[in-house]
Amino acid sequence: MPGSLPVNTESCWPKDVGIVALEIYFPSQYVDQTELEKYDGVDAGKYTIGLGQSKMGFCSDREDINSLCLTVVQKLMERNSLSYDCIGRLEVGTETIIDKSKSVKTVLMQLFEESGNTDVEGIDTTNACYGGTAALFNAINWIESSSWDGRYALVVAGDIAVYATGNARPTGGAGAVAMLVGSNAPLIFERGLRGTHMQHAYDFYKPDMVSEYPVVDGKLSIQCYLSALDRCYSVYRNKIHAQWQKEGTDRGFTLNDFGFMIFHSPYCKLVQKSVARLLLNDFLSDQNAETANGVFSGLEAFRDVKLEDTYFDRDVEKAFMKASAELFNQKTKASLLVSNQNGNMYTPSVYGCLASLLAQYSPEHLAGQRISEFSYGSGFAATLYSIRVTQDATPGSALDKITASLSDLKARLDSRKCIAPDVFAENMKIRQETHHLANYIPQCSVEDLFEGTWYLVRVDEKHRRTYARRPVMGDGPLEAGVEVVHPGIVHEHIPSPAKKVPRIPATTESEGVTVAISNGVH
């Protein structure tokens, strides 16, 4: 058929395409959810038990989506001693829009200036919390295409999740994840194993162009999330079953075939319910499921329920959450470290879960495992796909390196500063009043930011934003942070138009000696 390709093109693809390195960034301050319950005057446990959240990271007016992404990209490049020359594609997934035309990706290109590398494909991708996954799939597809030039792809997912005062506010958060994508990766995307579901709904959306706050239909949002999970899992199971049949194995796929399961996490309790939901899918698809004992023990009464009738059935939910408790503890709970401690990061949420998993298990434990990832973005778009971890867990291996790079994750979370709820509320008020302003100088201090964090210096009268980086103790001049470490491709250096914009130096001693960068002429 015209436009189609033969199936036997496997030998043409690069080997083991996937995630080579991963970096995560979250704000240096948080509000305690127990204290927030008291401050908001709600019942004890509403946020901590009902939502499953312990702490919520948040940004001051010193950080925006550009600064979050600048920080996480430079940290990934520095930690892995990478040259900016080795990046051939850079794509950003975000729903935090501060400019309706200029992309975050173009702001990040300032980090590439010293290398002279401007031959970098990709742009921003947006659909609620799904944008990071779409960007990641685009990167995988680029490497497996005729357009690939042998260099890495860099995928960035970042967001600032804020809500108006009320029930939704404790489900906020902020952060960014950067992923280096290439061949011979330790985290390999299983080709052909994606179950996707796309549908129209007004479950969560942001129609007000001057507000950061969404319009949310809470009940519909939960139904959309769970129905998408049902559909994606069904499509995924059909695809892997078809693959197995071609390989001579004819059996059904169940959750036991996943070593770990991670999910987009608006809040941790929904993830726990999602594991229960998948077990319900397994139960209903197996007409011979043993209910006298085992994981399905005592569930015979639910044999004839219909999935579409059970989204808000408390009896079904309670029974399957109990039945799936051990499954959740073994395969999912560890992945919720960042979600529980930092909140919902929107596009990077599911990849924060991946980072949490990698940070808490040894390479030997992870080797050879199949990890399922469920990504969901309101509106709505969802995919369930799987990653196969390499078998090579030897010291110095790619798997050893990626887990070692995340070994300080819990310590970084513990090093953050706890902020009182009233100060948090004041920060939210400042953001609401100033996030869209021109000719604005941020009010909050940079002293509480982590070392190496990029921050907003000012917004000029034309809405052009200027950034600086908080120095890293022990480093030399800040310019060294973006120098070429391992130049591999010779480029003609093309001066960036951003350099024509006057640099705005730090105005106070507390801001330190920094190199400021601007997003240039709009």
Curated annotation (Swiss-Prot):
Reaction equations catalysed? acetoacetyl-CoA + acetyl-CoA + H2O = (3S)-3-hydroxy-3-methylglutaryl-CoA + CoA + H(+)
Question: Can you cite an annotated GO cellular component?
Answer: cytoplasm
The record's PROSITE patterns line, in alphabetical order, gives:
HMG_COA_SYNTHASE
Entry-linked InterPro entries: HMG_CoA_synt_AS, HMG_CoA_synt_C_dom, HMG_CoA_synth_N, HMG_CoA_synthase_euk, Thiolase-like
User: Any one Gene Ontology biological process term?
Assistant: farnesyl diphosphate biosynthetic process, mevalonate pathway
The pathway noted for it is: Metabolic intermediate biosynthesis; (R)-mevalonate biosynthesis; (R)-mevalonate from acetyl-CoA: step 2/3
Q: Does the keyword Transferase apply?
A: yes
Q: Which GO terms describe its molecular function?
A: hydroxymethylglutaryl-CoA synthase activity
Provide the binding site for (3S)-3-hydroxy-3-methylglutaryl-CoA.
D43, A44, C129, N167, T171, S221, H264, K273, N344, S378
Q: So where's the catalytic machinery, residue-wise? A: E95, C129, H264
Upon changing C69A, the result is: Does not significantly affect biophysicochemical properties
Q: Which family does it belong to?
A: Belongs to the thiolase-like superfamily. HMG-CoA synthase family.
State the oligomer form and interacting partners: Homodimer.
What does this protein do, in the record's words? Answer: Catalyzes the condensation of acetyl-CoA with acetoacetyl-CoA to form HMG-CoA, which is converted by HMG-CoA reductase (HMGCR) into mevalonate, a precursor for cholesterol synthesis.
This protein is called Hydroxymethylglutaryl-CoA synthase, cytoplasmic
